[in-house]
Amino acid sequence: MALVKKPVTGMKDIQPAEMQIRDYVIGLIKETYKGFGFTPIETPCVENIANLSNKQGGENEKLIFKILKRGEKLNLETAQTEADLVDSGLRYDLTVPLSRYYSNNAANLPKPFKALQIGPVWRADRPQKGRFRQFYQCDIDILGDPTNLAEIELILATTTLLGKVGFKGFTVHINDRRILKGMAKYSGFDEAQYDEVFIILDKMDKIGLDGVAKELASNGFAEESIERYMGLFKGLNESRGWCCLSCRDTW
């Protein structure tokens, strides 16, 4: 059989010049984050399918590269559902592996624990320009510190790194699940619905507020709750615009 020279669709070869740049940037990342006390860790590329499908990954869970069971565990004749065929998959981000890692090793780690991860992740997405099925992610996390100081340190470390890399005039977007929960509760959603609501809300950049409202409605959520929820976000956008103008005029 002739050798297929091109990489699998959605994958790419890294040429020496690009690899040199990547190594330089990763070196800066490690140097900067280590300076803030973050410790590099490594987790397996393959995780238990139950962990990857825990409904915390949003749309990414639909993009898992799943791995068939092997040997005696794989029985095509008796398999009735996908769960009978699959027991593991490639990680789609670094958050799920970190949760498992910390749960398994917390007793032997300092508190708080400041973790740094850099590594490839995989998503069975539709390949398009600038969008690949394998790409690198970098995560920093502080576990065991519930104070806002931990959040501030994450922002400070990241903005320091971006400055070293050469970025200027960038904007840091901050998300706090506690705020989202408070808004959802005020709008009348049940707590059991939060995860589903947030998964849809995560699409806002792609489909806009109107698209989010339509998808919430198509999933059977109460119209009154949707209207109140969307009203909060419209108010936030107006306030954000006013704050940006005010800061620009002041500073």
Describe these PLM feature segments.
Residues 50-64:
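Glycine-rich loop at the start of a catalytic domain that most often binds anionic cofactors/ligands
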Residues 30-31, 42-43, 57:
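Generic N-terminal leader/targeting and pre-domain segments
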Residues 18-38, 47-48, 80-87, 93-109, ...:
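Positively charged, Gly/Ser-enriched RNA/tRNA-binding surfaces
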Residues 38-52, 70-72:
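Short active-site-proximal "capping" loops at secondary-structure junctions
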Residues 42, 53, 117, 171-173:
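Structured core elements
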